[in-house]
Amino acid sequence: MRKGYLKPKFLKHDYNYSSKQKTSNICICSIGKNENLYVREFVEYYFNLGIDKIFIYDNNDINGEKFENVLMDFIQNNFVEIIDVRGLSSIQIPIYNYCYRKYNKFYDWIGFLDFDEFLFIENNKTIKNYIYDEKFNKCQMIFFNWILYNDNDQVKYENRSLLERFSKPTMNYTQGKSFVRGKLDNLIIPSSHIPGINIYNFFFFFLDIIYPSDFFGNKFEKDPKAFIKHFYTKTAEEFCNKINKGHAHFHRNHSDYKSSIKNRINLFFSLNKKTKEKVNILEKCLITKIN
């Protein structure tokens, strides 16, 4: 259990859930642009994991692709709901906050995930078998570390699932994503990773956060209970497409935009073997010189 700075009195809801409770509703909030090649695998995966609902905020260009073209069956059975935020930029954090405020009263847990993030739970447990364990009874948030996967020496997209194409974990990362308890007052989400609580305009992390594996990524190999398989780069070709979609947090004319591209390229080659072919693909696509 990781302790923060708040006292329980700041939280209106003092949770003490039983694993045998009758209600068990878990949803995911996601936002995406140009993700039709990947979104169906994501939806099918979490359907099988036991998620009850996925809210997808459609951030495609006004005349761009539509999630409905690949998810209509899941939309019709009410597992997926598409919310139109097309044509807007750098809105991931506002959308996460909006989604929590709108839906937190209806769900016990809300997860905030991208379409390249797949929650793995050992022993093939469903998320409900896992998240309603008594060890989480008084927990307001569960943080799952990323394990980053490399490109398996592939350079271009193939019409196969991410889980099939990329099977080599390469880095235990200190970052990750969270599932947050519903019905929390004053919750704010300042980043895509860890929400917190706003008390008199001061931001605090949660009092009780559980990390199934070590926060600094040191126990993954010994204790792989639950973590997120994060296919951050995929291939060089797909990584270019990812960068060209724009940044989740600031506009293209922001002073930090160019440096963010450089940092992302550096991360790409820290995860993947640097080859002339990959460098050429990135330089041509991103119109930048790579040393």
Where would I find each of the regions flagged by the language model?
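N-proximal low-complexity "stem/linker" segments adjacent to membrane-targeting elements
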Residues: M1-E44
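Short, acidic, metal-binding catalytic loop of nucleotide-sugar glycosyltransferases
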Residues: E44-K53
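Short hydrophobic alpha-helical runs that function as membrane-insertion/retention elements
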Residues: K53-D58, E81-I82
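Active-site-proximal specificity loops/subdomain of glycosyltransferases
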Residues: N63-F112, I121
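Catalytic-site signature of metal-activated, phosphate-bearing donor transferases
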Residues: M1-L11, I93-P94, I121-N291
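Divalent cation-coordinating acidic motifs and surrounding scaffolds
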Residues: F106-D114, I127, C139
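Conserved short acidic donor-positioning loop in nucleotide-sugar-dependent glycosyltransferases
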Residues: N59-I62, F118
